[in-house]
From Swiss-Prot:
Binding residues annotated for ATP, in chain numbering: G387, E388, P389, D411, T412, W413, W414, Q415, T416, D500, R515, R526
Domain of life: Bacteria
Record note on modification: Acetylated. Deacetylation by the SIR2-homolog deacetylase activates the enzyme.
Protein name, UniProt field: Acetyl-coenzyme A synthetase
E.C. number(s) listed in UniProt: 6.2.1.1
A Gene Ontology molecular function term of the record: ATP binding
Signal peptide positions (record): none
NCBIfam families recorded: Ac_CoA_lig_AcsA, PRK00174.1
Disulfide bond residue pairs: none
List of residues that carry N6-acetyllysine: K609
Transmembrane spans: none
Length: 650
């Protein structure tokens, strides 16, 4: 590792951080050697109605799979996010909201948010919602989305948030699986200057003949646009709130009572409902938010994720509110109407902590540094990355242009299934390397195993597994515990299989190499697609790249690259050859792409995740049955890629 590629903890951060490197090592060691003692102490960071005496009862045996934390304690998640802050922080801002139009802004204190949540919790009860019922939420990025979630938690209902861009079929599948009687939506959302017909999508979902459970649809009036209305079923949010009481006693929930369902996106077949429970999740979301972002009282924290994803749940709602944070919520996208929007919002709201995704960083990179010429960024202290491995070139650009080389970057690795961050730098403790998620959080025991399940010691590469449970871990796949065991615990017995590959370097740092199915076997040698993608994107003319394997007569698999060039650059055969040589130089001859297809856009979900299964099929010339593309932000991208594919057979 060259000295230039190691970014030391800034001295001012180290002096004032929650933990330094020595403290991290001591706490981590304790959390592994004595997990019960460690979590017995740190479980106290949230408020309990009946304090726990039992800490951990877990088994990763796929025949006897069970995960229980703090399991004789009782609590309420909503009370932990609101009530416990009222005495000291009632007047503190809980939410700063900025609309798609920057001129539209709202602010809510903790006392005001508490009132809204209590009233809506009573409104839900008036519509027949009881403890244990699953309520489907399909909302835009407005404060009422968080209000709806916290109101469900307050009365012991289980929320199932569906991202506000999913298709009616996707909504229907989730409603059917959860048997939701009550749905919560808005007339329309606004995103990137466009109106999103949320209520229309809900109406279409309910018209599915298999949806027979829905009794009520609560509609928040966001735009006032024309919508269809079903008398007796549809009810306005504001009408319910006008008559709802401001007092709602929080329900006493067992630590292992369900808090929410969140369905994993992009899976084939039936949706997979990831079930998270109350106690362990709240402890873990709260603790990781404070330690990973080194959160200090009175700081403004901005997570750009949508509430429909796990990042929005853990690091826009439950973690920050449990810590009495001031949370910036943005309705739109941070590069609309211009790429300067991100910087403008950081300056306008004096944001101290920013948590965003590599896909946005690369999009901003492609627009050029000049978009940030008037950006000050002097309030910013910590920056985070989430959603996929960040390539080193994007990491450095983020560090230089957004962070002015002063802000540590926490490159966080975790999953919907993990509930919270598992591997990440801590700002005051961890020297960072661009592209590495670095070291595990407290209580997390990662390991690498080969394809036979044998542990890889020291430096090496393999399948990333976790050897023991942590409090934020999912408990089951809703309604299908066998599927939970099969998906995560049968591949490598007695271990949680993440589905990702990773390598560990000489410093014990972890580098996520991508999904295991994103590994290409070229002439018997394994290559992580993320590595080839990073090499391509490090070229100054490349904005984005996605790499997949395809059948090759000689090598077994060849390397097929989809490349998006920076704005204004024309694709040429000369540039294609230059990029092949560039990768050869960066990684080695083995990694040289066999085929490079120019791509004006890549197939992405609305959260920015590249859907590689489409790219693999197109590269393999299997274009007649690509499967459901309804979750893509722009399904038309697929047709363009098919038309210009390079592996056609006549």
């Amino acid at each position: 590792m060259t000295p230039q590629s190691l970014y030391k903890v800034p001295s001012d951060i180290a002096e004032n951080a929650l933990v330094n490197n020595d403290q991290y090592k001591k706490m981590y060691q304790e959390s592994i050697i004595n997990p019960e003692g460690f979590w017995r102490e740190h479980g106290k960071r949230i408020d309990w109605i009946k304090p726990y005496t039992k800490i951990k009862k877990t088994s990763f045996d796929d025949h006897n799979l069970s995960i229980n934390w703090f399991y004789d304690g009782t609590l309420n998640a909503s009370a932990n996010c609101l009530d416990r802050h009222l005495e000291e922080h009632g007047d503190k801002l809980a939410i700063i909201w900025e609309g798609d139009d920057a001129n539209e802004q709202r602010k809510l204190t903790y006392a005001e948010l508490h009132t809204q949540v209590c009233k809506f919790a009573n409104a839900l009860r008036s519509q027949g919602v009881n403890k244990g019922d699953i309520v489907t939420i399909y909302m835009p990025m407005v404060p009422e989305a968080a209000v709806a979630m916290l109101a469900c938690a307050r009365i012991g209902a289980v929320h199932s948030v569906v991202f506000g861009g999913f298709s009616p079929d996707s909504i229907a599948a989730r409603v059917i699986d959860g048997k939701s009687k009550v749905l919560i939506t808005a007339d329309e959302g606004i995103r990137g200057g466009r109106k999103i017909p949320l209520k229309r999508s809900i109406d279409e979902a309910i018209s599915n003949p298999d949806v027979t459970c829905v009794e009520k649809v609560i509609v928040f009036k966001r735009t006032g646009g024309d919508i269809d209305w079903v008398e007796g079923r549809d009810v306005w949010w504001h009408s319910l709130m006008e008559v709802a009481s401001e007092f709602c006693q929080p329900a006493e929930m067992n630590a292992e009572d369900p808090l929410f369902l969140l369905y994993t996106s992009g899976s084939t077949g039936n949706p997979k409902g990831v079930l998270h429970t109350t106690g362990g999740y709240m402890v873990y979301a709260s603790m990781t938010h404070e330690y990973v972002f080194d959160y200090k009282a009175d700081e403004v924290y901005w997570c750009t994720a949508d509430v429909g994803w796990i990042t929005g749940h853990s690091y826009m709602v439950y973690g920050p509110f449990a810590n009495a944070a001031t949370v910036l919520i943005h309705e739109g996208v941070p590069n609309h109407p211009t790429p300067a929007r991100l910087g403008e919002m950081i300056d306008r709201h004096k944001v101290n902590i920013l948590y965003t995704a590599p896909t946005l960083i690369r999009a901003l990179m492609a627009e050029g540094k000049e978009q940030f010429s008037s950006y000050k960024g002097d309030s910013l202290r910590i920056m985070g990355s989430v959603g996929e491995p960040i390539n080193p070139e994007a990491w450095r650009w983020y560090h230089e242009v957004i962070g002015h080389e002063n802000c540590p970057i926490v490159d966080t690795w975790w999953q919907t299934e993990t509930g919270g961050i598992l591997i990440s730098p801590l700002p005051g403790a961890t020297d960072t390397k661009p592209g590495s998620a670095t070291r595990p959080f407290f209580g997390v025991q990662p390991a690498l195993v080969d394809n036979m399940g044998d542990i890889v010691e020291g430096t090496g590469e393999g399948n990333l597994v976790i050897l023991d449970s942590w409090p934020g871990q999912m408990r089951t796949v809703y309604g299908d515990h066998d599927r939970f065991a099969l998906t995560y615990f049968k591949t490598f017995r007695g271990m949680y299989f993440t589905g990702d590959g990773a390598r560990r370097d000489e410093d014990g740092y972890y580098w996520i190499t991508g999904r295991v199915d994103d590994v290409i076997n070229v002439s018997g040698h394994r290559l992580g697609t993320a590595e080839v993608e990073s090499a391509l994107v490090s070229h100054e003319l490349v904005a984005e790249a996605a790499v997949v394997g395809y059948p090759h007569d000689i090598k077994g698999q060849g390397i097929y690259a989809y490349v998006t060039l920076t704005r204004g650059i024309e694709p040429t055969e000369e540039l294609r050859q230059e990029l092949r040589q560039w990768v050869r130089k960066e990684i080695g001859a083995l990694a040289t792409p066999d085929l490079i297809q120019w791509a004006s856009g890549l197939p992405k979900t609305r959260s920015g995740k590249i859907m590689r299964r489409f790219l693999r099929k197109i590269a393999a010339n299997e274009v007649t049955n690509l499967g459901d593309s309804s979750t893509l932000a722009d399904p038309a991208v697929i047709d363009t890629l098919i038309e210009s594919r390079l592996n056609k057979t006549e």
